[in-house]
């Protein structure tokens, strides 16, 4: 899943027999350094190193170095926040998957942005990293951004509908996520849209799931909104 933030990694490395114990000790030192760096953020962080059988094939040194350099140089994380909404991410990328198998290496990155020009800028920077490493780069699965409109008529109408139904105004947020509204808006420019739904738990992880008790509230809100929407 390119959408999931990486949380685990496994790699086989080869070293001279005389250096094995030093490498095992170094891994332990790295674990402690990372535990200190990510204290209170990643409580369960752990490293494990063990002897395994010598692999049948190894990545040639030049290709290995180019690949590692490209991964290090590849932009990852937040690129920019929305200028008018400083606490909300506008553009980012996720270096999600690195695979080496059957004589080939593949790196998968997901870029998202509410602004198309910034998404293209980030994609070009990523493409440059791997092109310079001699890798073939493809772009696929792109979807359009959706810029927030605080003056949206449907937003105003649904805020009032929510207040009438539940006795309080809803908490309206701009989120950094790929939404269907971006795809629809690219096909029907100028369409007034809003995105809402039941609560999602553990987003951007393999455990992402819907909070079932929130579905009934979402359904009631949706039907009430439709009932109060005037016909055109």
Where do the model's predicted regions map?
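Generic non-transmembrane alpha-helical segments
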Residues: 22, 26-37, 125-133, 153, ...
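A structural micro-motif
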Residues: 13, 45, 135, 168-170, ...
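Zn-dependent metallopeptidase/amidohydrolase metal-coordination segment
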Residues: 90-103, 166-225
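His/Asp/Glu-rich mid-to-C-terminal helical/loop segments that flank catalytic regions of hydrolases
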Residues: 15-20, 63-72, 79-81, 120, ...
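Short glycine/threonine-rich loop-to-helix capping motif typified by GTGT followed
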Residues: 4-10, 58, 147-160, 183-187
């Amino acid at each position: 899943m390119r959408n999931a933030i990486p949380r685990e990694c496994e790699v086989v490395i080869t070293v001279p027999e005389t250096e094995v114990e030093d490498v095992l000790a170094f891994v332990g030192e790295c674990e402690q350094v990372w535990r200190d760096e990510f204290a209170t953020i990643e409580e369960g962080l752990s490293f494990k190193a063990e002897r395994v059988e010598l692999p049948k094939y190894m990545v040639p040194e030049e290709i290995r170095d180019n690949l590692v350099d490209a991964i290090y140089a590849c932009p990852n994380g937040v690129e920019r926040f929305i200028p008018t909404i400083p606490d909300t991410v506008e553009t980012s990328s996720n270096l999600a998957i690195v695979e080496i198998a059957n004589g080939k290496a593949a790196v998968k990155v997901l870029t998202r942005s509410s602004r198309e020009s910034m998404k293209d800028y980030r994609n070009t920077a990523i493409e440059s990293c791997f092109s310079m490493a001699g890798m073939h780069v493809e772009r696929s699965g792109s979807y359009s951004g959706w810029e927030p409109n605080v003056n949206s008529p449907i937003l105003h109408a649904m805020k009032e509908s929510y207040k009438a139904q539940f006795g309080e105004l809803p908490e309206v947020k701009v989120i950094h996520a790929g939404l269907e509204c971006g795809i629809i808006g690219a096909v029907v420019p100028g369409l007034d849209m809003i995105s809402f739904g039941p609560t999602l738990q553990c987003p951007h992880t393999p455990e992402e799931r819907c909070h079932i008790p929130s579905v009934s509230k979402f359904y009631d809100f949706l039907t009430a909104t439709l009932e109060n929407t005037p016909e055109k």
